[in-house]
Amino acid sequence: MKYNQLGKTDLKVSELSFGTWAIGGSWGNTSDEEALKALERAMDAGVNFFDTADVYGDGHSEELLAKATKGKESEIHIASKFCRAGDIHDPATYSEESVTAYLENSLKRLQRDQLDLYQIHCPPFEILKDGRVFEVLDKLKQQGKIRYYGVSVETVEEGLFCLEKENVSSLQVIFNMLRQKPLEELFPTAKQKGVGIIARVPLASGLLTGKFTTDHQFETDDHRQFNKDGEAFNVGETFGGLPFEKGVALSNQLSWVAEDRGNRTRAALKWIMQQEGVSTVIPGFKNVRQVEDNLQAVEVPHFTQDELEKIRVFYKNEVHEHIRGRY
C-alpha cells in the first residue's frame, strides 16, 4: 500500500481508503458482522483511513468504526462529517453550540477523544460564503477536539471558494471516469495550495463496476432507487449525476479498461489513484469480497498516456453533456 500526505497535514493516508455510507444503511440490506470483517480485512491490507458521517445510519457507521478500530486509534485515521442531521439551510445548524454538539456525539459514537478530520457535509454555498462555520471549526481545532478540518463539496465553484480559506486541509469531491471536471482547475489549484483531495463516488454508485444492466432493480431503501433522479438530495451523489440507463451504456463503452486489470472496478479506482493531486479514493463496501476486489486496484497496471487521453476524450465527447445537477 502506498501512502500519500493529506495536503499540508501530518496525516499520511492510504491511497486506497474506504467510505462507510453503505455499511450504515441507504444501500440496501447490510450485515454488521460482515461489515466488521470487511473493515478488519481492509486494515490488515494497510488501509489506515476511513470516511464516515453522523447521518450514515444515524451514526451506526461511526459505531461500527469504533468497534473495528478499538486499540488502533493512533494508527487508523477517521474522518467524519456534520450538518445533515439538521436543516442544512439554517445558519443555526453551523453555530458553535450546534457544531460542538454534533462533534461530541460523533466522538462518543467513535469512542475517541479527538477526530483526525472533521468535514462540513455538502453545505449550501451561502453557508460557506457566510464564513462563520470556519471560525467555529478553528475554535474546535484550537481546543484539540479535531486535528484538521475540510469540506465535502458538490461543485467545483464551492471547492475553489474553500481553497481560499487558509485552514481548510482537505476537499472531498465527486470524481470518477464519468465525472472529470475537477481535473481542469480544482485539482491543480488544491495542489498549489497544499490541500488534500478525497475522491468520493469513485465507481459512480456502481455504474463503473460493469455489473448492472438497464433493467436492474434496486431495493426501495437504496439511494440508487430513491434518489436516482435527485429526489432526496443532490443528483450527483447517485450515479455521478447520470441517468441510470445512460450511465450503464457509457460504462459499457469503457469495458476495455478492464483488459490486464482484472475488472472494471479495479481499473476505475486505479485511474483515480493515478491522477495528480488525489490524496486518497474512498469506495464504499458492504462485505469482505468487495473490499478484497477494491484492494486489488493497488496492484493492477497503470494506465498509459495514450489510454489516459482516450478516457479524457471519451468523457469530453460522450459523457459530459449527460451529467445532471450542480457540478
Predicted feature residues:
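N-terminal binding-site loop/beta-alpha segment at the start of enzyme catalytic domains
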Residues: 1-76
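A short, structured active-site edge motif that brings together acidic residues
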Residues: 75-87
